[in-house]
């Protein structure tokens, strides 16, 4: 073969190999996750207070230039009242935390990302005198290692909300990719 032909073939093989090596390890663009949450999924089981609590959580994860992600959470819950009590009582439910945990369904997990509920005066606990919650949190920073782990195995993570009446957890649900 002529040297020019060998050079062209070598460059072609080299560039084909480079495409595979340079392929991104994580998906680009917004990734949507969701969770159907209920008290029956909480471990250990949620108490009889707020037993009817259920709802859904939608999560949109957007890549940032640093390899990290920002996430937006939309949370809708209902049934957050003391069982057998009129919903408008002042001692209705108070959501004190929303947390993403790493853990399998039916098992206790480790907290990996906490929403800013009740942590500052700007984001107080969510009072629910009517027994419902609809709230959105935007631009929640998700470190790159955590984002990669969640995107690789969403069902290995769950979302759980905690209330003043059920500090160990009022609703929980595993994350799933949409």
What does each model-identified segment do?
Residues 2-8:
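Sec-dependent signal peptide recognition
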Residues 18-98, 102-178:
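Metal-centered catalytic cores of metalloenzymes
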Residues 13-17:
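C-terminal motif of bacterial Sec signal peptides marking the signal peptidase cleavage site
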